[in-house]
A protein has these predicted regions:
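Amphipathic, non-transmembrane alpha-helical secondary structure
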Residues: 20-24, 49, 74-81, 183
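Donor/substrate-binding cores of folate-linked one-carbon enzymes
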Residues: 25, 87, 91-200
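N-terminal Rossmann-like dinucleotide-binding module
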Residues: 2-46, 50
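Short, surface-exposed acidic-centric catalytic microdomains
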Residues: 33-74
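Short, basic/aromatic-enriched C-terminal tail that caps enzymatic domains
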Residues: 20, 196-205
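Short, conserved catalytic or interaction motifs in soluble domains
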Residues: 13, 63, 114
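Short phosphate-binding loop-to-helix
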Residues: 64-95
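Proline-centered loop/turn at the N-terminus of a beta-strand
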Residues: 7, 34-37, 57, 108, ...
Length: 205
């Protein structure tokens, strides 16, 4: 018998393709969770239009509306509180998550990064891989900590880097692998099959 569904918030800044893939996997019953609120820092982000048919509350919390980082982070916490979320999914969220949020939801915030961490953290992971001359790159789903893409790694998958790759072609090749990897990682999280010991995430499946 499955446990009750995990209540999840999704944070997104962009087009929301990973978020949509996760939402569909929940609707199909693959992931034992449900998005109960969407938070974006851009009112014109793609996720706003993409999620209209989901019938999920969407809240815009724009950093420019707050006079300090602390008040911005508090607004995020205040927005989440009524929804009693069990976890937060970052899907193309382009801001560093604040300390308050990390402390409140320790080991409950998941992120996907378009490179094989710990290599190529930060922005432009695809281009960093091309510039670095690596022959294989991939994506990493990890728990979020206070560093830049430094949290414990849940799962990774790979794709080849081709000699004529551009940032766009590599991004297009990696995207379906990102969807697959994030869906599987979130499934495990929602079924309480991830255990963290130090820097290592152990999977029970």
């Amino acid at each position: 018998m499955r446990n009750s569904k995990k209540r999840l918030a999704i944070f997104a800044s962009g087009r929301g393709s990973n978020g949509e893939a996760l939402y569909k996997a929940m609707q199909d019953g693959y992931i034992n969770g449900e998005f109960v609120v969407i938070i974006t820092d851009h009112g014109d982000a793609g996720i706003v239009e993409r999620s209209k048919s989901w019938n999920i509350p969407l809240i815009v919390i724009d950093r420019s509306d707050y006079d300090s980082k602390a008040s911005f982070e508090q607004a995020q916490l205040d927005a989440l509180e009524p929804y009693k979320v069990d976890g937060i999914v970052l899907a193309g969220y382009m801001r560093i998550v604040g300390t308050k949020l990390i402390e409140r939801y320790e080991h409950k915030i998941l992120n996907i990064h378009p490179a094989l961490l710990p290599s190529f953290p930060g922005l432009h992971g695809h281009q960093q891989a091309i510039d670095g001359g690596v022959k294989i790159t991939g994506c990493t789903v990890h728990f979020v900590d206070a560093g830049m893409d430094t949290g414990p790694i849940i799962m990774q998958n790979t794709v080849p880097v081709l000699p004529d790759d551009t940032e766009d072609t590599l991004s297009d090749r990696l995207l379906p692998i990102e969807h697959k990897t994030y869906k599987e990682s979130l499934r495990l999280f929602c079924e309480d099959k991830l255990t963290i010991k130090g820097r290592v995430v152990y999977i029970e499946d």
